[in-house]
Structure formats: C-alpha cells, structure tokens
Amino acid sequence: LMVVTSNADRICTGITSSNSPHVVKTATQGEVNVTGVIPLTTTPTKSHFANLKGTQTRGKLCPNCLNCTDLDVALGRPKCMGNIPSAKASILHEVKPGTSGCFPIMHDRTKIRQLPNLLRGYENIRLSARNVTNAETAPGGPYIVGTSGSCPNVTNGNGFFATMAWAVPKNKTATNPLTVEVPYICTKGEDQITVWGFHSDDETQMVKLYGDSKPQKFTSSANGVTTHYVSQIGGFPNQAEDEGLPQSGRIVVDYMVQKPGKTGTIAYQRGVLLPQKVWCASGRRKVIEGSLPLIGEADCLHEKYGGLNKSKPYYTGEHAKAIGNCPIWVKTPLKLANGTKYRPPAKLLKERGFFGAIAGFLEGGWEGMIAGWHGYTSHGAHGVAVAADLKSTQEAINKITKNLFSLSELEVKNLHRLSGAMDELHNEILELDEKVDDLRADTISSQIELAVLLSNEGIINSEDEHLLALERKLKKMLGPSAVEIGNGCFETKHKCNQTCLDRIAAGTFNAGEFSLPTFDSLNITAASLNDDGLDNHTILLYYSTAASSLAVTLMIAIFIVYMVSRDNVSCSICL
C-alpha cells in the first residue's frame, strides 16, 4: 500500500503593486500608469534679476561712471571715461536711450542705439590707447579738432567724445568726397569697433564752419558692408544735453565692426567726425533684456522671469531668451517613469489540476514589497510571504538614472550644439529674428519630448528583462528542490516560509537546508505490516505466486469465451 501526501509550496517572481499610480507618456503605448515618476519640468514665477552664480554679470557698462548712460560710455563722453569690467553675461537695461548727455545726436538715422548693446555682447571690452586716424592731417585738411561747450570735460571746459574728432577745416572751402583708411589697431585679435559720424547745422553755421552750405555725402565700408548718408541742413530747434549749452546743430553717429587685420574706409565731405579711439572687444556673449539693480545670485537669467535657480532640466510657460545654467523650454510638462508599470494587487486563482495555473505577478502586483520593485512570493500553509530583490531593484533604478543622464547629455551636448549653431548665426546678423528663435525652441522641445517618450518606453519594457533575470536566478538557486510550472512560478519539494524567501531574495538560499526528508514535497510511505515471522523473500514469493495464478486463470477464461463464440466448443450447464 502506498500513500502520497503534498507538503509543497509555490514560489513566484513578480513586481510590486501600488495604490497611487501616476501617468507617463510613451512612444508606442501612449499614456501608461506607473508606480512612480520623476517630474522633469517646472513652471517658474517672475523674480528680480540677479548676478549669475560664479560669474560677473554686467548691468551698466561702466559701474563706476556716475550719472552716465551706457551710450555716453560707448561714445566716450568726457565725464564718462572708465574701465569696463569683463563679464560672462550682460543685461540690456536701456532699450532706447533718449540722449547722449553731450552733443545732440540724431539717434534714428543710424543704428547708434545698438552700440551699447553690441559692446555688452562681448566678455572683454577695452578702449584703445592710441587713435586710429590723425584728424589734423587727414585728407582735405589741415583741420582743427573742434570741441563744444555742450560736451564739457572733467574740468568743465569744452570737450568732445573720445571716440571721434570733429574735423573743422582751416580753409573754409567746399570739397569733393575724400577717403581716409581706417587701419586695424587692436593688438589681441579682438573685434575692432570703430565709431565715426558727421555734423550738420543750418546754412549760416555750415558756411561759417566749413565754407559750404550744401548737403554733404558720407560713406563707410568695412567687412563688405557699405553705408551711405547725406547730411540734413537746418531745421533743428536749439537743444541742450545735460549740463551743455543749447545747440542748433546735430550730429549723426555710426559705427563699423572690423575683424582682425581688416581695413575700413570712410569717404566724406565737410563736417566729418573722424574716428579716434576704438573699442577692442573679444569673447562673444549673449545679451538679454532685463532691469537693474541685480539682487543676489541665480543659476539663470530669463527675460520673462528674471533670476531663476535651476531645479529641473526643463520648464514650461513663456519662452524667451535666457543666459546661464538654464532649464530648456518645452511645450508640455514631462515626467520620467520612476518605478514599474502599475498593477493592481494580485488575486490567486484556485488550482486547476495538480499543476494548475496560478494568477501570480503576471496578472497583478504583490503588496508589501516596500523595500523594492521586483522580488519573490511564496504561497502555502503559512499564507503568502513577500520579499524584495534589492539587486534587481537597484538595476532598474540604475537604468532610470542612466536615462536621466542620457537626457542630461542630450540637453548639454546635442541641444546646445543646435543652439550654438543658431548663436553663430546670431553673431553674424547681430539680431536673430524672433520667429527663427521660436522655431528653434519648438524644434528643441520636440526633440526633448521624443527623448522622454523613448526613455519611458525603455524603462517600462525593461520590466520583462528584470523578471526573466529573476526567474533564471530563482531557478538556479532552487535547483532540483523545485519544479518549474510556468508564469515565473516553481513548485517546491519543501516548505518555504518568510525566512526561506528572505534568503532567496538575499541570494543566500541553500537548498540543502530545506532538502528531503525534512520538507519532502511528496512523502512516499510504505504501509505498516504486522511482524508474523515471515521474511522478505517469503512475502515476495507469495506475491509472485498469486500474481502468476491470476494471470493464467484470466488467459484460460479468455480462450474459452473465444472458442464458444466460434461454435468450436459447446458448453452445457446442468443443475
């Protein structure tokens, strides 16, 4: 007699469950519920402008030049001469300066308003020690270098801008256009910014100063850029700038940028303001609109939000120019999966046969696995035991960290490479059209969104890899002490309570500690027999004799039935 009993447990691999799912977007699965997320975006609020952390931020061109506009400094007004400190970033705080603080300027006839902004766009700016032209001996001379009471110097005497020489001819006669070469005199390979201009007044003053009352012609040329002007005669009301005297005349001021080694030219008639000291500038930097004073420090300066501290790699809200360690603008909020695909708590189904299917982790997640995302569970007389596999969980976390790093690399390298190309274009044309800038932002936003979608896809799809690895690990540890029954589950030949499961999760499980017969899954026990003096050989003889007799009897009976059915044998029964 044989008795079969089952003391087996089932051990399964699986994923934790959660009651508070989040939603992330993926490339092919759309929106997916997950157990955790890492927000990648923030929406900033407006703040005051600040200094960029770790760098010098330029507000005013010359912080020590009191009562001076940046245009005064750029033109070299006598009372506004000072060093311009180097800076990695600059704030455009004067959008449209109205006066020069010196001789009245016709701002709207040239791009002179842009000169301070141009200078702000360089990290290092210095005024040359020597003059680029000799005004007194220039063609059409000799000249007297004029000064004006409307442009007082530091001793309140008559003065004029340091960047230009007012060339008043000693011989008051008209002249045909003359040309002067403007050499490159910067010594460190910088861009040379040369300021020049011309003066005009009413007819009486024009004849008095220059001997010619007709409109005068002027042309500048540098780096393939040529600009033409014709002076306006008369019609100006008297105007005083700051402490200066009222003036009926006006000056038109322009500038040209000369690259290293390049010579510029100026063609002129009477009333020319010949270039003198030039700006030598190097290290192109971005300039954004903002306001002063600069308060505190910030990671990023943003035209719309002011000073920002970077807490997330991306931001939503208003897109605008920014400088520093800034988050990148994206159209919509982005989240990276930081966990597993959401599964409701699993419910075990009843067995279907001896090796019936179990609704394990593949049909839901297991509660209680608070120390990790992946792990094991056992089911038996002890109930349900759950243990997290920390190594597998750490591998999943490492994958997410790798995705975050990849997104950061995308931000720092690829996207900045695209922005850098646009910045080069910006350097060439000085002002990038807002529509082009918006297109760049849209393109970068789309690239980032796709990268996040693909990252989420990879994180979620990697769950199958982790589960398969866990299953292989579990199979190897259990060895011959268990039978694989599918769906990541194994039927053990021993009991496996919480202690057993914890050892499996820790990788210290030893099947020998739970081996037969102590926890034998199928206990095969011989039937008890009374000892009546028979030895084993006698017992076996009885068994074999009885079995042989039974076999012979059955064969004879079958033969008789066959013969009767063929009418070869008749059978009579007598009572």
UniProtKB/Swiss-Prot annotation:
Post-translational modification: Palmitoylated.
UniProt keyword terms in alphabetical order: Disulfide bond, Fusion of virus membrane with host endosomal membrane, Fusion of virus membrane with host membrane, Glycoprotein, Hemagglutinin, Host cell membrane, Host membrane, Host-virus interaction, Lipoprotein, Membrane, Palmitate, Transmembrane, Transmembrane helix, Viral attachment to host cell, Viral envelope protein, Viral penetration into host cytoplasm, Virion, Virus endocytosis by host, Virus entry into host cell
Family annotation (InterPro entries): Capsid_hemagglutn, Hemagglutn_HA1_a/b_dom_sf, Hemagglutn_influenz_A/B, Hemagglutn_influenz_B
Lipid-acceptor residues (S-palmitoyl cysteine): 571, 574
UniProt superkingdom: Viruses
GO molecular-function term, one example from the UniProt record: host cell surface receptor binding
One Pfam family, short name: Hemagglutinin
GO biological process terms, semicolon-separated: endocytosis involved in viral entry into host cell; fusion of virus membrane with host endosome membrane; fusion of virus membrane with host plasma membrane; virion attachment to host cell
Disulfide bonds: 12-489, 68-80, 102-151, 496-500
Main localization, broad class: virion
Gene3D superfamilies to which the protein is assigned, alphabetical: 3.90.20.10, 3.90.209.20, Hemagglutinin Chain A, Domain 2 (2.10.77.10)
Keyword check for Disulfide bond: yes
Stretches assigned to the Cytoplasmic side: 565-575
Glycosylation sites: 33, 67, 131, 153, 171, 309, 338, 497, 523, 536
Chain positions of site Cleavage: 352-353
GO cellular component, as recorded: host cell plasma membrane; membrane; viral envelope; virion membrane
Bilayer topology annotation: Single-pass type I membrane protein
Membrane-spanning intervals of the chain: 544-564
Subunit organization: Homotrimer of disulfide-linked HA1-HA2.
Family of this protein: Belongs to the influenza viruses hemagglutinin family.
Further comment: Major glycoprotein, comprises over 80% of the envelope proteins present in virus particle. The extent of infection into host organism is determined by HA. Influenza viruses bud from the apical surface of polarized epithelial cells (e.g. bronchial epithelial cells) into lumen of lungs and are therefore usually pneumotropic. The reason is that HA is cleaved by tryptase clara which is restricted to lungs. However, HAs of H5 and H7 pantropic avian viruses subtypes can be cleaved by furin and subtilisin-type enzymes, allowing the virus to grow in other organs than lungs.
Protein name as annotated: Hemagglutinin
Species of origin: Influenza B virus (strain B/Hong Kong/8/1973)
Lineage: Viruses, Riboviria, Orthornavirae, Negarnaviricota, Polyploviricotina
